[in-house]
């Protein structure tokens, strides 16, 4: 569910900003400042370039990282680079992560972070905004789409036009693997939260969920008719394959089980990222 296996977080305040990119602090509905970056499409696709056509732009892909990640981590920068060949890209650091304010609620209030990123993309003129989430981010984009997509959804400007969830859990409080037991220690114990803050630059809230948010499996049937793609590796050390199969059986969704793939953005190579981009933005 996170990048704990990658070791200590390294700050990248000198992360180069690509040509035409914009770095901005967004503000969520509950007042949390988010570090975010907008990158224009680098390819010459007329339908998705950042050149205005009648005052409008094409697709923007909003990328939601995993727990302990940030917009500056190499795996997210790689994803943004690949996605930008098809569309504009918005990356951001979830609350409590990287250069953003607040404290992580490990997937609960983070829905508001995705809302802020999607609304920013739409404010820049993008008529089609899609979301891609990894691990914790994968569960968040599912809940975001359930709350803001479909015929029953919330504000129109927060609505996603398609959703990709990579390496997401199907249910909360899962402790069936050693990595998830370690993660629960980080989240629930004072010593663990200290390790998260010092070792991974992740500030974690010390309160339990109240109420418990909609689970990813409960969210899936509420997403239709918004297109949904689920991606999961058959060597994921965090969540075994019963998780994606449970999600896929909950409602209309396409499922890709990737042979030899591990967990989340760190295991997503350029070939897979390119296929995801192609699913989101067909030629």
Tell me what each language-model feature is.
Residues 105-124:
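Alpha/beta-hydrolase active-site loop
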Residues 2-54:
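N-terminal cap/lid segment of alpha/beta-hydrolase-fold proteins
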Residues 120-182:
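Primarily recognizes the serine-hydrolase "nucleophile elbow" in alpha/beta-hydrolase
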Residues 73, 95-108:
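Glycine-rich "HGGG/HGxG" loop immediately N-terminal to the catalytic nucleophile
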Residues 67-80, 242:
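The serine-hydrolase catalytic nucleophile loop
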Residues 6-14, 18-24, 34, 105, ...:
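The alpha/beta-hydrolase serine catalytic core
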Residues 57-66:
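Short beta-strand element of the alpha/beta-hydrolase
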Residues 80-101:
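Conserved alpha/beta-hydrolase
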């Amino acid at each position: 569910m996170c990048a704990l296996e990658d070791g200590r977080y390294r700050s990248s305040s000198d992360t180069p900003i690509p040509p035409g990119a914009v770095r901005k602090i967004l503000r969520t509905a509950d007042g949390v400042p988010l570090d975010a970056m907008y990158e224009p499409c680098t390819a010459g696709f007329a339908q998705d370039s950042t050149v205005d056509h009648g005052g409008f732009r094409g697709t923007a892909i909003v990328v939601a990282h995993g727990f302990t990640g940030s917009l500056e981590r190499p795996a997210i920068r790689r994803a943004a680079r690949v996605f930008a060949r098809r569309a504009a890209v918005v990356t951001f650091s979830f609350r409590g992560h990287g250069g953003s304010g607040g404290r992580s609620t490990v997937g609960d209030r983070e829905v508001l972070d995705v809302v802020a990123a999607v609304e920013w993309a739409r404010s820049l003129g993008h008529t089609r905004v899609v979301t891609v989430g990894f691990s914790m981010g994968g569960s968040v984009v599912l809940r975001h789409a359930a709350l803001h997509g479909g015929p029953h959804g919330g504000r129109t400007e927060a609505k996603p036009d398609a959703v990709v969830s990579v390496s997401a859990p199907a249910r909360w409080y899962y402790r069936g693997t050693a990595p998830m037991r370690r993660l629960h220690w980080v989240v629930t114990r004072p010593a663990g939260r200290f390790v998260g803050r010092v070792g991974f630059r992740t500030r974690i809230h010390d309160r339990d969920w109240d109420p418990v948010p909609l689970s990813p499996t409960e969210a899936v049937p509420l997403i239709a008719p918004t297109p949904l793609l689920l991606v999961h590796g058959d060597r994921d050390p965090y969540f075994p394959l019963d998780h994606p199969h449970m999600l896929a059986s909950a409602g209309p969704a396409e499922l890709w089980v990737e042979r030899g793939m591990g967990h989340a953005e760190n295991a997503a190579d350029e070939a897979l990222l390119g296929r995801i981009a192609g699913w989101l933005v067909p030629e």
